Amino acid sequence: MSTNTEFRTCPTTGLKVDLAAEKLIKVNAVAAVVFLAIGGLFGLLVALTRWPEVHLLPADWFYLALTAHGLDVLLVWIIFFEMAVLYFASAVLLGSRIAAPKWAWAGFGLMLVGALITNVVVLQGGSSVMFTSYVPLKAEPGFYLGIILFAVGALIGCFVFFGTLVVARQERTYQGSIPLVTFGALTAAIIAVFTIASGAIILIPTCLLYTSDAADESS
């Protein structure tokens, strides 16, 4: 199958790198580091508040910072980084073109928009439900919408990874079995699909319910 995919050869490792995959790896890795820094900042605020001599934030801002810290450190940065690893372990290590790069960019866009929406909603107050957001804690509908969009984008990234493995197999870009790192990434992607999909499915009725409640309160 002929394609217009552009490659370069890494001067250090000698690996053949799909330029489209390289860009996706970079943007996902950068987004991961940015949200790790944001989450770390919120974590510092939480730590300074827990320090009795400082006690930086009042109670409402403490739980706001704790919620943002949990989301960015335990969810957003980890999954952005996982997407970068998945694209590296498939396209780069197997010397393959990435499957459906437009879908991969769409997934990244959804993840970025979702993460930004959730962070903004948390900073606006009224959504300090912490990372677990257990009942009866209730957040604004945008909080759940942002997480759902982020989850859908991550699922798209996982399926692009699976597709890239298929492309590499069909085009015989590697010999024998897949490398151990790629096998580990495959295992992580399978686990991610089940966990992310189940989380998103649970949040969809929650988002719809709270959106309906918000509409009733405003009417």
Where do the PLM segments sit?
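Membrane-interfacial loop-to-helix junctions in multi-pass inner-membrane proteins
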Residues: K16-V33, L93-V113, P136-I147, V166-I191
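Alpha-helical transmembrane segments of integral membrane proteins, especially early/N-terminal helices
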Residues: V27-G43, H69, W103-V121, A192-A200
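Hydrophobic positions within alpha-helical membrane elements
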Residues: L74-L75, F194, S218
